From Swiss-Prot:
HAMAP family: PurT
Protein residues bound to Mg(2+): E258, E270
Protein name: Formate-dependent phosphoribosylglycinamide formyltransferase
Record-listed E.C. numbers: 6.3.1.21
Binding positions (N(1)-(5-phospho-beta-D-ribosyl)glycinamide): E12, L13, E72, D277, K348, R355, R356
Alphabetical GO biological process terms: 'de novo' IMP biosynthetic process
Length: 387
């Protein structure tokens, strides 16, 4: 069962996916907008195109005739996926899922209005005047997000009326779609955030990974740990919501479903129809299969009987602090001296401030507390420099 996989997006998540695919004898063509992207370094072939250009996407599909089209990022002309499905191509997890999750408006309305899931109160704004009206309804603080963005780009937390103009400007210049409509959300005073990795299968039941806790800065993942502290009642509710939304979107693969937890409530936040950055903690051997192996097996139709927690783990990101076209790596010798720890350097060809260049991992089978594992992962990340 050797499949030709066209990977659209070739970042660090794509790289680990390709490694998983190589281990099961699959053939991968890695695509991105720049050369020497991480996944290209381990794939069989590469293509460099602007994936927001539908005509270029069509050409790549016609050239390679892949068995599977696997999106890894949001910046893709996903509207073309419907046509590819009509032509007989398998889009992962489905054309519907890729299109709905590309746009926060589509997925939020689906979750809140159609599926009646609990979410933060929200409004949309297409002008600064509409943003002002939205803040008057939702109050301060509130959160502003472009409808199309990732890794916190263009997001702001508005604390007062004086910050509205700056937040509007950021939303219009840093999102994927440029000047466009935005979503404004009430700020939920949450106790924690979790990612519930959810696996939908062609040949098996829907499975849930042990919940992953995470911490963000600038709207982007900084740390994650597994398992996260969560009550049985909250876990069941999160699983119910994740099951409902993934069933509605259809398809097979792994989904990163994010939730806010308060003392007595679980709020649906966002969803990604692919491996999730916070799920890199599974590279620490926390599960019987890491998230990339799970994604691959699900899309290939290889049955996954169960997902088990093997040990506790934590991860922390290694960020660049400067812009450099010839980055240097240092500190690996120091970092390698820490027990029950590991690291991954992604191999991105260029650095810029806050760009994620690697991840550190810590783990324990001896009952070590999550707080201790988190500290070790963060300490490890501070020792490694990629600049």
């Amino acid at each position: 069962m050797k499949k030709k996989i066209l990977l659209l997006g070739s970042g660090e998540l794509g790289k680990e996916f390709v490694i998983a695919a190589q281990r099961l004898g699959q053939y991968v063509i890695a695509v991105d907008s720049y050369d020497d992207a991480p996944a290209m370094q381990v794939a069989h072939e590469k293509e460099i195109i602007n994936m927001l250009d539908g005509n270029l996407l069509d050409q790549i599909i016609a050239k390679h005739k892949p068995d599977l089209i696997v999106p890894e990022i949001e910046a893709i002309k996903t509207e073309r996926f419907y046509e590819y499905e009509k032509q007989g191509y398998q889009v992962v997890p489905s054309a519907k899922a890729a299109n709905f999750t590309m746009n926060r408006k589509s997925i939020r309305d689906l979750a809140a209005k159609d599926l009646k899931l609990l979410t933060a109160k929200y409004a949309y704004a297409s002008s600064i005047d509409e943003l002002i009206k939205a803040t008057e309804i939702l109050g301060f603080p509130c959160v502003v997000k472009p409808l199309m963005s990732s890794s916190g780009k263009g997001q702001s937390v508005i604390q007062s009326r004086e910050e509205i103009s700056k937040a509007w400007e950021a939303s219009q210049t840093k999102g994927r779609a440029g000047a466009a409509e935005i979503i404004v959300e009430e700020f939920i005073p949450f106790e924690s955030e979790i990612t519930l990795l959810t696996v939908t299968q062609k040949n098996g039941k829907t499975l849930f990974c042990p919940p992953i806790g995470h911490r963000q800065e600038r709207g982007d993942y900084q740390e994650s740990w597994q398992p996260a502290a969560i009550s049985e009642v909250q876990l069941k509710e999160a699983q119910r919501m994740a099951d409902a939304v993934t069933k509605e979107l259809t398809g097979f693969g792994i989904w990163g479903v994010e939730f806010f937890l308060t003392e007595d409530k679980v709020y649906f936040s966002e969803l990604s129809p692919r491996p999730h950055d916070t799920g890199m903690v599974t590279l620490a051997g926390t599960q019987n299969f890491n998230e990339f192996e799970l994604h691959l097996r699900a899309i290939l139709g290889i049955p996954i009987l169960e997902i088990t927690l093997e040990r506790k783990g934590a991860s922390a990101v290694i960020l660049a602090s400067t812009e450099n076209k010839t980055p240097e790596i240092s500190g690996l010798d120091i970092a390698s001296g820490m027990s029950e720890s590991d690291f991954r350097i992604f191999g991105k060809p260029i650095t810029r401030p806050y760009r994620r260049m690697g991840v550190t991992l810590s783990y324990s089978t001896k009952g070590e507390e999550i707080s201790s594992l988190r500290k070790r992962a963060v300490l490890l990340a501070s020792k490694i420099k990629v600049d």
